[in-house]
Amino acid sequence: MSSTFSGDETAPFFGFLGAAAALVFSCMGAAYGTAKSGVGVASMGVMRPELVMKSIVPVVMAGVLGIYGLIIAVIISTGINPKAKSYYLFDGYAHLSSGLACGLAGLSAGMAIGIVGDAGVRANAQQPKLFVGMILILIFAEALALYGLIVGIILSSRAGQSRAD
């Protein structure tokens, strides 16, 4: 590395790994949730086409999960500038844990939204009273990803606090 580099030379690897983990895992959850609940919407649309727009809620909720990963990835990547200020292993590990917290929470929420959305829209076609219950379960599943986003922001903000620069 050049002499203008400040901090630990391997630390940015962990920081960028955290940004990648946040985006990749969150988008995997979003893709799974969208695909799984989308199959349910398509299957239900054959029987009850008038309910397709009402049943698109799980697909939208799953798609939002990717945005959470994008937010954390941008926060992490803007915090990695070793030439401007020192970037140590503590910072890299903080960013890695931030990305993993948000990404894995998004992955698990996407799986939950996909499974609940698939079963929920199919059940809604048979019994419309189940719609409210499906929405409540989807909200609780989405909250899992929000918890990961909040913890990711907190962990990412810890980067740079290990020293008095």
Swiss-Prot record:
Residues that span the membrane, as ranges: 11-33, 56-76, 96-117, 130-155
Keywords tagged on the record: Hydrogen ion transport, Ion transport, Membrane, Transmembrane, Transmembrane helix, Transport, Vacuole
Location in the cell reads:
Vacuole membrane
Q: What topology in the membrane does the UniProt record assign?
A: Multi-pass membrane protein
Q: Which residues lie on this side of the membrane: Cytoplasmic?
A: 34-55, 118-129
> Which residues, by range, are in coiled-coil regions?
none
Which loops or segments lie on the Lumenal side of the membrane, by the record? 1-10, 77-95, 156-165
Q: Which GO terms describe its cellular component?
A: proton-transporting V-type ATPase, V0 domain; vacuolar membrane
Q: Which CDD domains match?
A: ATP-synt_Vo_c_ATP6C_rpt1, ATP-synt_Vo_c_ATP6C_rpt2
One Pfam family matching this protein: ATP-synt_C
Q: Where is this site: Essential for proton translocation?
A: 142
Q: Name one GO molecular function term.
A: proton-transporting ATPase activity, rotational mechanism
Q: Which cysteines are joined by disulfide bonds?
A: none
- UniProt tissue specificity: Higher expression in leaves, followed by roots and weakly in flowers. Expression in leaves is light-dependent.
Main localization is membrane
Top-rank taxon of the source lineage equals Eukaryota
Function, in words: Proton-conducting pore forming subunit of the membrane integral V0 complex of vacuolar ATPase. V-ATPase is responsible for acidifying a variety of intracellular compartments in eukaryotic cells. Necessary for the crassulacean acid metabolism.
Quaternary structure (record): V-ATPase is a heteromultimeric enzyme composed of a peripheral catalytic V1 complex (main components: subunits A, B, C, D, E, and F) attached to an integral membrane V0 proton pore complex (main component: the proteolipid protein; which is present as a hexamer that forms the proton-conducting pore).
PANTHER family in the record: V-TYPE PROTON ATPASE PROTEOLIPID SUBUNIT (PTHR10263)
The entry's family comment says:
Belongs to the V-ATPase proteolipid subunit family.
Protein name from the UniProt record:
V-type proton ATPase 16 kDa proteolipid subunit
